Amino acid sequence: MENLIIAIDQSTSATKAMLFNERCEMLRRVNVTHEQYYPKSGWVEHDAEEIYRNVQKSIAELIKEEVADNMYSLAITNQRETVVVWNKHTGKPICNAVVWQCMRGADICNELKASGY
């Protein structure tokens, strides 16, 4: 059996996992959506644990036992500047992920810009 490639696209709205062969032909695709949270006006957050579970779920649905031994490569893309702070002792997120669309830092950016930065 030929070598297989997994591609994971963890985007703003979902985790997408794709399985390709060596000729870059897509063999399977899985899409698992996640919630977006808006705790305040202009704020956008994701549950980092949900995203982690969705990545695990998408890979499990994508690969079958018969192809697991033929995995050759893994490619990952993610959501631009989305940030998650993890507890170094527990491995758990301290708070929700701050999504790249979130505007909570806009005032700080505007102040820096006005100061010449």
Residue ranges: model-predicted function:
Residues M1-C95:
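N-terminal glycine/serine-rich phosphate-binding loop of ATP-dependent small-molecule kinases
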